[in-house]
Amino acid sequence: MSAARTLRVPGRHGYAAEFSPYLPGRLACAAAQHYGIAGCGTLIILDQNQSGLQIFRSFDWSDGLFDVTWSEDNEHVLVTCSGDGSLQLWDTAKATGPLQVYKEHTQEVYSVDWSQTRGEQLVVSGSWDQTVKVWDPTVGNSLCTFRGHESVIYSTIWSPHIPGCFASASGDQTLRIWDVKTAGVRIVIPAHQTEILSCDWCKYNENLVVTGAVDCSLRGWDLRNVRQPVFELLGHTYAIRRVKFSPFHASVLASCSYDFTVRFWNFSKPDPLLETVEHHTEFTCGLDLSLQSPTEVADCSWDETIKIYDPVCLTVPG
C-alpha cells in the first residue's frame, strides 16, 4: 500500500467520512469530542494536494456529529446529523453556521444519506428514537416518518437504482427495505442475531444489499430471496462499524471495524479477503471509496486521524 496521507485532528474522534461526488480530492468528515459521549462536534472539509491533506473549512456544532452526506445537487452543500437529534445543512462556500437545522428526532441521529437517483433530492435519517425520517432539504420539516424498528437505527441508505427506496439497519437485528411512495416497509430481513451497525447497496445489482454487524460478519442479501445470505465474509475480530461497496468493481467491498482495521473483500472469490489495512490505533468508524479514483479510499478513526490511501488490492489487476 502506498503511504497514507494523514491529517491529525486533535480532540476530535472521527465517525464518518465521505468523498465529494463533484470535486476530486475533497473529503468531508463528521467528528465528535470525547468519543461522542459528551462535548461538541465538528464537520471537517479537507482537500488533498501534492503536499498532503489540508483543512479547507471546519464547522463546529454544539453536540457530536455522527454522519455526513454530500448533496447530489450542489457541490458546496452537505448534511450532517447529531447527538442532539438534529440534522444540519451546511454550505462550504460560506464560513458561517448551518443554513438550516432540522429538529424532529427525539434522540441521537446516527445516519444520514442524500438520494442518488435523478429527479429527486431527498435526505433520509435514522435515529436512536427508532424512527426513520425522509426530508426535502428545501423544506424545514420531514415529509414522512417510518416506524417499525424495535431498537436504535444505526444505518439508513438510499438505493442507487430504485427511486424512493432505502434500506435501514438496526439494533433489533433486522435489515429493512422501505418505499417512500407507499410510506411503508417492503421487506424485513432478520439478517443477524446481533445488532446490525451498517448496510450498503451494491452499485451494480439493484437486488444486492450487504450488512455488517456486531457478530463480526458481513452478509450479502438478494432481495428476491432473503431466506439466507448469498455470501458471508468472516475475518474481523470485533464489531463491523461500516461497510461500503466499490463504485468500480461489482463484487468488491470494504469494511471497517472496532478491531482498528479496514478490510477489502471480493465476495466472488473462493478466498474473499483481499487485504487488511492496520494503520489506526483506535476504533475505525468512517469509511468511503472514491467515486473519482478506482484506487482511493478514505477512513477516519477515534485515534484523531483521517487518512486517504490506495490499498494494494485496488491498484493491481484482478
Swiss-Prot record:
Pfam families: WD40. GO terms for biological process: endochondral ossification; ether lipid biosynthetic process; fatty acid beta-oxidation; neuron migration; protein import into peroxisome matrix; protein targeting to peroxisome. It comes from Cricetulus griseus. Keywords: Cytoplasm, Peroxisome, Protein transport, Repeat, Transport, WD repeat. Changing residue 199 to S: Does not affect peroxisomal import of proteins containing a C-terminal PTS2-type peroxisomal targeting signal. Receptor required for the peroxisomal import of proteins containing a C-terminal PTS2-type peroxisomal targeting signal. Specifically binds to cargo proteins containing a PTS2 peroxisomal targeting signal in the cytosol. Cargo protein-binding triggers interaction with PEX5 and formation of a ternary complex composed of PEX5 and PEX7 along with PTS2-containing cargo proteins, which is tranlocated into peroxisomes by passing through the PEX13-PEX14 docking complex. The gene is PEX7. Interacts with PEX5; interaction only takes place when PEX7 is associated with cargo proteins. Interacts with VWA8. Its main location: cytoplasm. WD repeats lie at residues 60-100, 104-145, 148-188, 191-231, 235-275, 279-317. Belongs to the WD repeat peroxin-7 family. It is found in: Cytoplasm, Cytosol; Peroxisome matrix. GO terms for cellular component: cytosol; peroxisomal matrix. One of its GO terms (molecular function) is enzyme binding. This is Peroxisomal targeting signal 2 receptor. CDD domains: WD40. SMART domains: WD40. Coiled coil: none annotated.
